[in-house]
């Protein structure tokens, strides 16, 4: 009798296990929501690093006067002379 029972269980196992798993999953799902209670209010999303950086850059730009810029000639004086003036003729 036992070998026949095991053969039947082995043959029809997929048809038996899916409904059992479905019922166990549904009961567990509803039990979890019952224990957890009300859903919490969604937390306001925090700004990403890129958004915070853009906000900081915009705040920095608001305080500057963009009409006052350094001329390109003055910027060249700050470059290391050993590298950039190696192949240039000396200034007179």
Swiss-Prot record:
Membrane topology per record: Single-pass membrane protein
Keywords: Membrane, Transmembrane, Transmembrane helix
Domain of life where this protein originates: Eukaryota
Pfam families associated with the record: UPF0767
Gene Ontology CC entries for this record: membrane
Organism of derivation: Mus musculus
Parts of the chain that traverse the membrane: 15-34
Predominant place of localization: membrane
Recorded family membership: Belongs to the SMIM12 family.
Record bears the keyword Ribosomal protein: no
Protein name: Small integral membrane protein 12
Subcellular location: Membrane
InterPro entries in UniProt: UPF0767
């Amino acid at each position: 009798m036992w070998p026949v029972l095991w053969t039947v269980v082995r043959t029809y196992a997929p048809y038996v296990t899916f409904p059992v798993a479905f019922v166990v999953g549904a009961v567990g799902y509803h039990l979890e929501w019952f224990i957890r209670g009300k859903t919490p209010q969604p937390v306001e999303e925090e700004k990403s690093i890129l958004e915070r950086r853009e906000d900081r850059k915009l705040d920095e730009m608001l305080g500057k006067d963009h009409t006052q810029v350094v001329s390109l000639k003055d910027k060249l004086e700050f470059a290391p002379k050993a590298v950039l003036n190696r192949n240039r003729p000396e200034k007179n």
